[in-house]
């Protein structure tokens, strides 16, 4: 039962395998047959049996089919045999036809091959044309690039390169020539950069050389504009009758208008001739280089290089020549180069974007301004010529106005000019010191004579002198001052004009200018003129007459100071009543000069007295006096009388002081003559002769040589001599010794030491020359009295020494 069940199960499987074998390709039968052996043992036998049964079935079907079609096959063979002959004939015909076709086809093949070859050529030509049409624009653009490079149109060349790279090269990137072009473009760009940089360097060198010309042109233009504006202002002021500008020459209004018209016409012509910076410099290299580097994307490198090089040039421009201070051309060249530099930078600032910024120019200008101020401060200190300093100021003002017109701040320059103004005043003071010295050297120190009205008016026009008494006098007459006074007055006004020249165009108010003029004038008066006067007064060749005239001159110059103040007021239109207005110090200046002159008069007078006294030739051993005063003393008194007559033009106190000083000095000199240590002996006759001379001095003092003394004030100058001589002449020692130290003493002014010195000289004389022989013979008691007096005088002297 079990075996039957197994056999039943394998039959369908074998049928499946048979179906699979029948329907499967023979190459795949192996796995199917293997499955037969992989099944149950002996299954293949059953499969073989099943296979044999299947084969037998198929053989039967084939046999049936053959039997069914056999008659038809026989009929077909019969028909085929019938057409066999026709087939042979057809074969022959076909062979012949084929031969003929082959023969004819050979020519067709040849023509066909030609046609194919032509077609290929045509296709290739078409392809080439298409490719050439694609490449030609590239080649044309590259050729254009080469032409632009040759023509130095580098910016256009860079634009062409951009087009080639962005538009044309992608079309033909597969071709070798395109690769070569692509590889060559960076080199061309570098060449353009180098060429552009070379052009920029040439440009920088060119503007460095032309900076002075550029600056000169810009400064001329600024100066012309300023002059034109000033001319218009003058015209408006004249039109409205406001003469705000005081000129030293009074030109009629019609002449002013004519001159102004010509001036304006000249300014118009000059403005037409002035070139601009674009006319003087070709800026195209900068533009090209900037555009090229912008296109190349390296604009920052270009900007850094340009600014670095320009800073180097700025340092070179700001470095002055060592001898710049010697001539105005040195300063002018320095200024024009700086102006040229910054005019170029300003132009670059306004025509380019980013290459030069306002912050960069401001930084550069601040650096330059500090250097300029330091240079001008240093070099101007070497200037000793006021005209050169004034030229420097004018150049600096034009320089500042020019750069201010380009937007650069210049206030510090005007502050510097304010400093230089002090130096300018110093140079003016030195110059005017020479002028004053020349005036004093040329003066004859005598009153100015005038013989007619014309000469009188000439003097009045030069110096503001008013004296009704002098006006009433008939010609010829004399002004009290000498010729130097109007000359000094004129030169002081000239100094004010010169000082005003520097103050103009400094952008200062009228009040400041007024203050500056007054201060500088005060310096001229208190320092320069005062110093010149003092030096003049102390000169050895200046005599008493000249000193008297100098005192008179200073008096009139002092009175003229108020006119100088009015003169400054007319220039500045600042009233003297203004709170902060500086006053002129002429009063103290001329007072000091007068005091110095007075002191010099006293000194000179004393020196003259000393000269006369040195002529004294006393015989100190004479036994009897001559009976008349010494000749030298009479000459001295006559000299003093004549001198004091000249002093009548001096203020009373000056003459009185001089007279008192002279008498006191004469008294002192005579006293010193008596007490001279080299004088060892003196006789009573010499004392009597000396007394005659002192009497003449007292008579001179009592004659009132100078009015104004009260009583015998002048005689008191000789009181010491008088009491001493009276003591010896009267021989009143008992009274002297008894009253010594009493306020009411008759010989109060006689010093014991002085009396002792003179008495010892007389004592020695008596011993050597026997002057007192009669006393020794007739009255030895008197000799003892002398010795007693000497002892008492020594006792008084010693007592005084101990008390002191």
Swiss-Prot record:
<dbReference type="Pfam" id="PF20651">
    <property type="entry name" value="EXOC6_Sec15_N"/>
</dbReference>
<dbReference type="GO" id="GO:0005886">
    <property type="term" value="C:plasma membrane"/>
</dbReference>
<keyword id="KW-0963">Cytoplasm</keyword>
<keyword id="KW-0653">Protein transport</keyword>
<dbReference type="GO" id="GO:0090148">
    <property type="term" value="P:membrane fission"/>
</dbReference>
<dbReference type="GO" id="GO:0006904">
    <property type="term" value="P:vesicle docking involved in exocytosis"/>
</dbReference>
<dbReference type="InterPro" id="IPR046361">
    <property type="entry name" value="EXOC6/Sec15_C"/>
</dbReference>
<dbReference type="InterPro" id="IPR048359">
    <property type="entry name" value="EXOC6_Sec15_N"/>
</dbReference>
<dbReference type="GO" id="GO:0090522">
    <property type="term" value="P:vesicle tethering involved in exocytosis"/>
</dbReference>
<dbReference type="GO" id="GO:0000145">
    <property type="term" value="C:exocyst"/>
</dbReference>
<dbReference type="GO" id="GO:0090543">
    <property type="term" value="C:Flemming body"/>
</dbReference>
<keyword id="KW-0813">Transport</keyword>
<dbReference type="GO" id="GO:0006893">
    <property type="term" value="P:Golgi to plasma membrane transport"/>
</dbReference>
<dbReference type="GO" id="GO:0005829">
    <property type="term" value="C:cytosol"/>
</dbReference>
<protein>
    <recommendedName>
        <fullName>Exocyst complex component 6</fullName>
    </recommendedName>
</protein>
<comment type="function">
    <text>Component of the exocyst complex involved in the docking of exocytic vesicles with fusion sites on the plasma membrane. Together with RAB11A, RAB3IP, RAB8A, PARD3, PRKCI, ANXA2, CDC42 and DNMBP promotes transcytosis of PODXL to the apical membrane initiation sites (AMIS), apical surface formation and lumenogenesis.</text>
</comment>
<dbReference type="Pfam" id="PF04091">
    <property type="entry name" value="Sec15_C"/>
</dbReference>
<keyword id="KW-0268">Exocytosis</keyword>
<dbReference type="GO" id="GO:0000281">
    <property type="term" value="P:mitotic cytokinesis"/>
</dbReference>
<comment type="similarity">
    <text>Belongs to the SEC15 family.</text>
</comment>
<dbReference type="GO" id="GO:0006887">
    <property type="term" value="P:exocytosis"/>
</dbReference>
<comment type="subunit">
    <text>The exocyst complex is composed of EXOC1, EXOC2, EXOC3, EXOC4, EXOC5, EXOC6, EXOC7 and EXOC8. Interacts with CNTRL. Interacts with RAB11A in a GTP-dependent manner.</text>
</comment>
<dbReference type="GO" id="GO:0006886">
    <property type="term" value="P:intracellular protein transport"/>
</dbReference>
<dbReference type="GO" id="GO:0030426">
    <property type="term" value="C:growth cone"/>
</dbReference>
<keyword id="KW-0966">Cell projection</keyword>
<dbReference type="GO" id="GO:0048471">
    <property type="term" value="C:perinuclear region of cytoplasm"/>
</dbReference>
<dbReference type="InterPro" id="IPR042044">
    <property type="entry name" value="EXOC6PINT-1/Sec15/Tip20_C_dom2"/>
</dbReference>
<dbReference type="InterPro" id="IPR007225">
    <property type="entry name" value="EXOC6/Sec15"/>
</dbReference>
<dbReference type="InterPro" id="IPR042045">
    <property type="entry name" value="EXOC6/Sec15_C_dom1"/>
</dbReference>
């Amino acid at each position: 039962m079990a075996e039957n069940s197994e056999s039943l199960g394998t039959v369908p499987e074998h049928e499946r395998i048979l179906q699979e074998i029948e329907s499967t390709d023979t190459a795949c039968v192996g796995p199917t047959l293997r499955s037969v052996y992989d099944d149950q043992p002996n299954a293949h036998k059953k499969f073989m049996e099943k296979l044999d049964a299947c084969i037998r079935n198929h053989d039967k079907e084939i046999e049936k089919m053959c039997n069914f079609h056999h008659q038809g096959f026989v009929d077909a063979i019969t028909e085929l045999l019938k057409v066999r002959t026709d087939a042979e004939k057809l074969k022959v015909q076909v062979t012949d036809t084929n031969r003929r076709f082959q023969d004819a086809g050979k020519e067709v093949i040849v023509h066909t091959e030609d046609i194919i070859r032509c077609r290929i050529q045509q296709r290739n030509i078409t392809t080439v044309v298409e490719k050439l049409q694609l490449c030609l624009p590239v080649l044309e653009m590259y050729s254009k690039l080469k032409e632009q490079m040759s023509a130095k149109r580098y910016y256009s060349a860079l634009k062409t390169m951009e087009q080639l790279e962005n538009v044309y090269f992608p079309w033909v990137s597969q071709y070798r020539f395109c690769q070569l072009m692509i590889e060559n473009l960076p080199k061309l760009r570098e060449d353009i950069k180098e060429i552009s940089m070379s052009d920029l360097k040439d440009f920088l060198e060119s503007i460095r050389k032309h900076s002075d010309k550029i600056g000169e042109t810009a400064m001329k233009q600024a100066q012309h504009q300023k002059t034109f504006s000033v001319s218009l202002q003058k015209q408006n002021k004249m039109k409205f009758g406001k003469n705000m500008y005081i000129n030293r020459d009074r030109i009629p209004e019609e002449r002013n208008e004519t001159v102004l018209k010509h001036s304006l016409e000249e300014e118009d012509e000059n403005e037409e001739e002035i070139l601009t910076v674009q006319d003087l410099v070709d800026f195209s290299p900068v533009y090209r280089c900037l555009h090229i580097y912008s296109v190349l994307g390296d604009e920052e490198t270009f900007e850094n290089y340009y600014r670095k090089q320009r800073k180097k040039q700025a340092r070179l421009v700001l470095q002055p020549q060592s001898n710049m201070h010697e001539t105005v051309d040195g300063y002018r060249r320095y200024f024009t180069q700086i102006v040229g530099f910054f005019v170029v930078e300003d132009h670059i600032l306004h025509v380019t974007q980013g290459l030069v910024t306002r912050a960069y120019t401001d930084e550069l200008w601040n650096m330059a301004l500090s250097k300029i101020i330091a240079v001008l401060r240093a070099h101007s200190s070497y200037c000793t010529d006021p005209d050169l300093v004034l030229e420097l100021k004018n150049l600096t003002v034009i320089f500042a106005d020019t750069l201010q017109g380009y937007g650069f701040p210049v206030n510090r320059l005007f502050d510097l000019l304010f400093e230089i103004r002090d130096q300018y005043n110093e140079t003016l003071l030195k110059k005017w010191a020479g002028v004053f010295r020349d005036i004093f050297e040329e003066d004859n120190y005598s009153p100015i004579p005038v013989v007619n009205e014309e000469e009188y008016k000439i003097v009045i026009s030069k110096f503001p002198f008013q004296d009704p008494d002098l006006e009433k006098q008939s010609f010829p007459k004399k002004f009290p001052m000498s010729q130097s006074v109007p000359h000094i007055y004129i030169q002081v006004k000239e100094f004010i004009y010169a000082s005003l020249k520097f103050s103009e165009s400094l952008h200062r108010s009228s009040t400041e200018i007024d203050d500056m003029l007054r201060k500088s004038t005060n310096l001229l008066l208190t320092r320069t003129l005062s110093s010149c006067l003092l030096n003049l007064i102390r000169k050895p060749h200046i005599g008493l007459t000249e000193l008297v005239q100098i005192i008179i001159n200073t008096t009139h110059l002092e009175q003229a100071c108020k006119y100088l103040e009015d003169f400054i007021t007319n220039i500045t239109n600042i009233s003297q009543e203004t709170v902060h207005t500086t006053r002129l110090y002429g009063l103290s200046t001329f007072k000091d000069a007068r005091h110095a002159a007075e002191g010099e008069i006293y000194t000179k007078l004393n020196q003259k007295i000393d000269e006369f006294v040195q002529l004294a030739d006393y015989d100190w051993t004479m036994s009897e006096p001559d009976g008349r005063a010494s000749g030298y003393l009479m000459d001295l008194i006559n000299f003093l009388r004549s001198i004091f007559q000249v002093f009548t033009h001096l203020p009373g106190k000056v003459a009185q002081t001089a007279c008192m000083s002279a008498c006191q000095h004469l008294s002192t000199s005579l006293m010193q003559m008596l007490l001279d240590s080299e004088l060892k002996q003196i006789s009573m006759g010499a004392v009597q002769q000396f007394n005659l001379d002192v009497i003449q001095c007292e008579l001179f003092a009592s004659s009132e040589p100078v009015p104004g003394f009260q009583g015998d004030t002048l005689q008191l100058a000789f009181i010491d001599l008088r009491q001493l001589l009276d003591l010896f002449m009267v021989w009143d020692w008992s009274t002297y010794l008894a009253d010594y130290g009493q306020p009411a003493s008759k010989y109060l002014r006689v010093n014991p030491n002085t009396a002792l010195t003179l008495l010892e000289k007389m004592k020695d004389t008596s011993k050597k020359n026997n002057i007192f022989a009669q006393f020794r013979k007739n009255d030895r008691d008197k000799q003892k009295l002398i010795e007693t007096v000497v002892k008492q005088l020594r006792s008084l002297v010693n007592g005084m020494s101990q008390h002191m």
